Curated annotation (Swiss-Prot):
GO cellular component, one term: cytoplasmic vesicle membrane
The name this protein goes by in its record: GDP-mannose transporter
Membrane topology qualifier: Multi-pass membrane protein
Localization in the cell: Golgi apparatus membrane; Cytoplasmic vesicle membrane; Endoplasmic reticulum membrane
Originating organism: Eremothecium gossypii (strain ATCC 10895 / CBS 109.51 / FGSC 9923 / NRRL Y-1056) (Yeast)
Positions in the Cytoplasmic compartment: 1-13, 66-79, 131-133, 196-214, 267-273, 320-329
Described function: Involved in the import of GDP-mannose from the cytoplasm into the Golgi lumen.
Gene name of the encoded protein: VRG4
């Protein structure tokens, strides 16, 4: 069984506070995005698999410590569950790797906006594989998502037009590579979510079971990929595994633990409706953090695309809640 310990002591007013859970969830999301961008956005860093390995290792270590302290419970490793969950871990590695590659080339606001395209793939995947349906309001949110992506692209082009020719050509090549990795990530993310839904029904996993198995099974896959595809020469290791990079990777890993923990916390002390709305609203501060901390395009189209992406998230969250409240046919 996987469960989260609820504090009933002196700090119970914090542990049961809706606003605190929402702030913690938003802060964790922003922290993870910003720290990841700090690492992958550097021209010096080229060991993404090592970064992902470090993040998964931090997650596993944190879960083991939390379990030892009695704050969480999760299912121990066993052959049957490992066999059933291995494909999910492979998809997780592909999803996180392509996400990191996209984040390397794209500005945080653009990355956040294009990430919404995954919602469309998942929705129609559920129609194909689970007999779901898409409501008119959901379709409206999808149109807003596509529109926000188009406007974001136009904003990028407007920013490029102001650069010298050589710099503009280099930036265009980088953006095209980023778009490729972003669309690949959307496909991997949709497959991950859709197949994981089936496997959760098979294994009866709870939240912390999923988190533990996702990360611990990813460790050997990530290390193998690193040894196969990355440069483990002394000079490259010295350039990549500096004290600053290691600290940022640890912080990012802890932030991912925080996101998972705060997700369950938020649902427990508020409601699934509030949580879904927070997920939609959280797109705005993440995108704005990219404008604040990094050299992202700052023109009308770029800002407007963030607003459209934010609006599409709200419309989609409301549409999902309305659909869930309707009686099944």
């Amino acid at each position: 069984m996987s469960e989260l310990k609820v504090d009933t002591g002196r700090l119970s007013h914090i542990a049961n506070s809706g606003p605190m859970s929402i702030l913690a969830y938003c802060a964790s999301s922003i922290l993870m995005t910003v720290t990841n961008k700090c690492v992958v956005g550097s021209d010096k860093f080229n060991m993404l698999f090592v970064m992902l390995f470090a993040q998964s290792l931090v997650c596993v270590t944190a879960l083991v410590l939390l379990k030892a302290l009695g704050y969480v419970q999760y299912r121990p490793l066993n052959k049957v569950d490992v066999k059933n969950w291995l494909l999910i871990s492979v998809l997780l590695v592909l999803m996180t790797y392509t996400s990191s590659r996209a984040l390397k080339y794209l500005a945080v606001p653009i990355y956040t906006i294009f990430k919404n395209l995954t919602i469309i793939l998942i929705a129609y995947g559920e129609v194909l594989f689970f007999g779901g349906r898409v409501t008119a309001m959901e379709l409206s949110s999808f149109l807003l998502i596509v529109l926000s992506s188009v406007v974001a692209t136009l904003g990028d082009q407007q920013a490029l037009a102001k650069k010298p020719l050589a710099a503009a050509v280099e930036s265009i090549l980088g953006l095209n590579v980023g778009y490729f990795w972003m669309f690949t990530n959307c496909i991997c993310s949709a497959l991950f979510v859709l197949i994981m839904r089936k496997r959760i029904a098979l294994t009866k996993f709870k939240d912390f079971d999923t988190m533990f198995y996702n990360n611990i099974l990813s460790l050997p896959l990530l290390m193998l990929a690193s040894f196969m595809f990355e440069d483990w020469g002394a000079a490259n290791i010295a350039r990549n595994l500096t004290k600053d990079y290691i600290i940022i990777m640890i912080i990012s890993g802890l932030a991912s633990v925080g996101i998972s923990y705060c997700s369950g916390w938020c649902v427990r002390v508020t409601s699934s409706t509030t949580y879904s709305m927070v997920g939609a609203l959280n797109k705005l501060p993440i995108a704005l953090s990219g404008l604040l901390f990094f050299d992202a395009p700052k023109n009308f189209l770029s800002i407007f695309s963030i607003f459209l992406g934010f609006l599409s998230g709200i419309v989609y969250a409301v549409a999902k809640q309305k659909k869930q409240s309707q009686p099944a046919n």
